[in-house]
Amino acid sequence: MFFHGTSRVNGKGHLEIGGVDTVELANLYGTPLFVYDVALIRERAKDFKQAFADEGVQAQVAYASKAFSCIAMFQLAEELGLSLDVVSGGELYTAQQAGVSMERIHFHGNNKSRAEIEMAVEAGIGCFVVDNFYELDLLADICEQKRATANILLRITPGVEAHTHDYISTGQEDSKFGFDLVSGQATLAVKKALAVDSIHLLGVHSHIGSQIFETTGFVMAVEKIFEHLVTWREDHGFEPSVLNLGGGFGIRYIEGDTPRPVGDYVKEMIRAVKQQIAEHEMSMPEIWIEPGRSLVGDAGTTLYTIGSRKEIPNVRHYLSVDGGMSDNLRPALYQAEYEGALANRVNEQPVGMFSVAGKCCESGDMLIWDLPLPEANHEDILAVFCTGAYGYSMANNYNRIPRPPVVFVEDGDAQLVIQRERYEDLVRLDMPLVKKVKV
């Protein structure tokens, strides 16, 4: 069994995270329950920042907040000196409520609405990552109306395919995101952006995908980007002050996953950039990256209570838990795989393979297939590891199931940062049927 961060087995044979007994957490807050190891998040943030310091380059590390968003998480990111990557008005509003410095906000998204752009311009955010011509024109119009200026990066698709799931690949030419380099879209976008007085083009952004273990794709993306940067300098006098290379750094979910230390990704990126800078006699831009999963993914653990069991002789043994695709959509959406253990009996040896089923009314609601476990009983607490990214963020109310609470743990203390939804919350926005009165 592989433990992440501060996770360990305590004297009671229980899983402990951040110095807190997870069985006690389950008893106190109920299940399902998300538990975040804050010390591990701090360590990862420090590793990314130190990696850039070791390379001697100016950099911004922006937390990709779609991985997990809430007021407390945004406040922690600010405390750690991270910028914040948001992709919606809702995430921007959460950042405002958290008291985050707006100058550290980078606003992404392939279809920002007029209302969202106006909200961001009025808030004075640090940078828009412009995804398409529609947005470029809309932003220019809004800035003109409000007599404001906006810093932007142009998101480009470098034509690099990361070795990952199709749904989380974004750097190839056939993608809903960004300006294509090959067709000339990106060149036209640079020309248009430079012609607008209210827009300040800082540089370009590239993101090739997610859950990436190799550095080759990042290096190839840098090389392709600089091929065009050289041309843009010659033809348009544009040289970037910022180069954003995105995120996508992989983590270990299951045995066989082989992520690199974060310093390896940074080192290879910077090496590639410095090589291009020297070759083309350009100035070194500030480097931005956007880790999300790699900051919070393996810091999160979900606790469930085991309920019903079903055994099909010589076929499969099912264990059903009190959560499922309503709190972790990734197995159904991406065929994502996870590891787990009985939090209340961690040291006991497995007796067989069990498949963990969620409680939603869907045959595809399976959290884990073939998990080695001891003989599991009703009311045992199952811990599923590495659920810190895209678990709560994708949580939903399918089957009218309330979303779970979230607890931060550190140095023996636990803090509730998101309350459990109640049934009352599920109908709070509902309106009753109005019956027409017959005359």
From Swiss-Prot:
PROSITE patterns per the UniProt record, alphabetical: ODR_DC_2_2 (PS00879)
Keywords in UniProt for this one? Amino-acid biosynthesis, Decarboxylase, Lyase, Lysine biosynthesis, Pyridoxal phosphate
Residue sites binding substrate per the record? 293, 330, 334, 362, 390
Range of residues in the leader sequence: none
Describe its assembly: Homodimer.
Please report which protein family the annotation says this sequence is part of.
Answer: Belongs to the Orn/Lys/Arg decarboxylase class-II family. LysA subfamily.
Supply the name of the protein: Diaminopimelate decarboxylase
The top of its lineage is: Bacteria, Bacillati, Bacillota, Bacilli, Bacillales
